[in-house]
């Protein structure tokens, strides 16, 4: 993946391979930090959030976007989408996309069964991030969370 990115990007863009739980950057190296669809894919979300806070300067903003399981009225349409429509659409594209379509819904459900929203917000605060807020997007199927590094 990095080789393909290097081929497509300008030379001045520096790509760095690393692990979310142990980033190869100095303390406070970044003024701000964003991530997308990360916490479902790491073994220890708490460790990852502490590491993201470590590499962000004090006062810097940290923000993340994740998929979420909608509440209330939007839950049944979401379930239909991730259980049937997404895998079907994936199958129309390719076998690999069919696998992705079948993986996504269970992955999101299992993550929030292990890490309910309230607990995730606590992890952010425990990592040294203050003024933590979150907002549901896309009829509840997404959630953006942000705060400031203390």
Predicted regions and their residues:
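Class I SAM-dependent methyltransferase SAM/SAH-binding core
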Residues: 1-23
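A short acidic, Gly/Pro-enriched loop at the edge of an enzyme's catalytic core
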Residues: 21-33
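A conserved beta-strand element that flanks and buttresses the S-adenosyl-L-methionine
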Residues: 34, 63
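Short catalytic micro-motifs in class I SAM-dependent methyltransferases
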Residues: 37-40
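A short glycine-rich, Lys/Arg-flanked "PGG" loop and its adjoining helix->strand segment in the class I
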Residues: 46-61
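C-terminal alpha-helical "lid/dimerization" subdomain adjacent to the S-adenosyl-L-methionine
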Residues: 69-127, 133
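Core SAM-dependent methyltransferase catalytic element
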Residues: 126-150
């Amino acid at each position: 993946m990095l080789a393909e990115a290097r081929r497509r990007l300008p030379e001045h863009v520096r790509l760095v391979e690393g692990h979310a739980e142990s980033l190869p950057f100095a303390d406070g190296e970044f003024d701000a930090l964003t991530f997308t669809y990360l916490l479902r894919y790491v073994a220890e979300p708490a460790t990852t959030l502490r590491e993201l806070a470590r590499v962000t300067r004090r006062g810097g903003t940290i923000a993340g976007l994740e998929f979420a399981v909608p509440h209330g009225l939007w839950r049944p349409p979401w379930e239909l989408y991730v259980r049937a429509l997404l895998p079907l659409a994936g199958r129309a594209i390719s076998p690999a996309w069919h696998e992705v379509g079948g993986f996504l819904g269970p992955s999101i459900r299992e993550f929030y069964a292990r890490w309910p929203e309230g607990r995730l917000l606590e992890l952010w605060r425990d990592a040294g991030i203050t003024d933590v807020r979150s907002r549901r997007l896309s009829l509840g199927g997404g959630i953006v969370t942000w705060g400031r590094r203390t």
